Swiss-Prot record:
<dbReference type="Pfam" id="PF16957">
    <property type="entry name" value="Mal_decarbox_Al"/>
</dbReference>
<dbReference type="InterPro" id="IPR005777">
    <property type="entry name" value="MadA"/>
</dbReference>
<dbReference type="InterPro" id="IPR037171">
    <property type="entry name" value="NagB/RpiA_transferase-like"/>
</dbReference>
<protein>
    <recommendedName>
        <fullName>Acetyl-S-ACP:malonate ACP transferase</fullName>
        <ecNumber>2.3.1.187</ecNumber>
    </recommendedName>
</protein>
<dbReference type="GO" id="GO:0005737">
    <property type="term" value="C:cytoplasm"/>
</dbReference>
<keyword id="KW-0963">Cytoplasm</keyword>
<dbReference type="GO" id="GO:0016740">
    <property type="term" value="F:transferase activity"/>
</dbReference>
<comment type="function">
    <text>Alpha subunit of the biotin-independent and biotin-dependent malonate decarboxylase multienzyme complex (EC 4.1.1.88 and EC 7.2.4.4, respectively). Acts as an acyl-carrier protein (ACP) transferase component. This first step in malonate decarboxylation involves the exchange of an acetyl thioester residue bound to the activated ACP subunit for a malonyl thioester residue. Has a weak activity with acetyl-CoA as substrate.</text>
</comment>
<keyword id="KW-0808">Transferase</keyword>
Amino acid sequence: MQKEKVWDKLSTDTEERMNAANELFSDRKVVPSQNGVALLEAVIRAGDRINLEGNNQKQADFLAECLGSCDSEKINNLHMVQSAVPLPIHLDIFDKGIAKKLDFAYGGPMAAKVAEFLREGKLELGAIHTYLELFARYFMDLTPRVSLICAYEGDKDGNLYTGFNTEDTPVIAEATKFRQGIVIAQVNKLVDKVQRVDIPGEWVDAVIESPKPFYLEPLFTRDPANITDTQVLMGMMALKGIYGEYGVQRLNHGIGFFTAAIELLLPTYGNELGLKGKICKHFALNPHPTMIPAIEDGWVESIHSFGGELGMQKYCEARPDIFFIGPDGSMRSNRAYSQTAGHYATDMFIGGTLQIDKYGNSSTATASRVAGFGGAPNMGCDAKGRRHVTDSWLKCGAEFEDQAALLGDMPRGKRLVVQMQETFKEKMDPSFVEKLDAWNLAKNANLDLAPVMIYSDDLTHIVTEEGIAYLAKCRGLEERMAAIRGVAGYTEVGLSADPKETKTLRERGIVKTPEDLGIDRSRANRSMLAAKSVKDLVDCSGGLYEPPARFVNW
């Protein structure tokens, strides 16, 4: 007689694991913090796929410490799937043998350490993803068996308030719980009733009030005092030669001083150019403090945020016409939704990088740093499924002559994808190279694919201190390479430029210098910025912006 097939192995296994942890609970779903390590040892098995909530900003740091304190004889060979690995403890668990494999999106401060662990064989890399790509795999082949998340508030029934820094939590919890997994949350505070139910209690198996609030990284805060004159010049070129030229109204700004400079130029140079009301209306963007002057000056209509930003909560709550504010009066971020908006609803992505090769491929992965990509590849690409029309999208598509080779006379738009980078970085390290370091990283980490952030066929513009290369206007790869050489300065790539060829490209408007754009280099200095310090941002916000202590020097 044929044995009856069992269809509920996952839920049965989950029940067995939770039963093993029964004695650790104090009240309904509450587990005392001193039982944190024991709880993880009860519900996690060697070889499990684990999500440890490491976001851009908020970190489930207490649960990370608990995981790092587990007995590696019991808990080992874990496959970690998480957005970011910005804390030392995230790699300590690999050093201790508790974890073996990593699939992630962003390395941040641990970028150099990730590269070191790869070289030493302490860490096996699955892939470097973009955020939305990793989230998608949570619902396919990388579903966590146990997820360790964090929230501001939780109650005895497991309801969570994630609020300003909701970030990745909903997608993690849903993917895990609806595949019969286990969800454990650390909360800053246990309350009788949460301020707002962001994660329903049915999705949460255990709640731990952590000894201290979860760590928040002010990742997108840039001190205007550190913006250089060169960055101001490049910002002026971008505003006049790209934003104004294409009338970009829906966009995303990547992290860094280049885009911070642009944000602070809107109320000054942007107004001088008469661009208010014509550009920069709708953003998929974290609440950058450097956006405050532009918001106050009436440039922005809406901002949906991937995450919060430390110190910006009161300001966002006081501007409900701009930010997405709930009935309780607090903002809710959501990385999955904002990444979706960034992919389909924006007309431009603009941000920095670490290396660009002679073809225009761009990467933040170098021989010594595995920085990851975050959301850049998701927004820094042409969304082929897009079907709605905007003027800037159509204009860029009309310029993209190579598209006709595959589509014939069928019109289609194209997203503007802009990389801003000075020709040399710190220590005179060239930004333009013949071959990306990503190739060596792929070899050292046994990756099938070199980790490229933005591929050349998606890249439409490069901005350096030398000028702008309008790559979408180029006819074929050779002309694109010539345009790149024309703005690559004194790098090896730039020195191979043919002056006559560059001159022809300038005449055709494919390469534009500041002079071609009518920009006076002598005006490109910090005096053009709407705020020149963090104190200026605080004053502009009417005291609503409360910067982290590291940025307070007055």
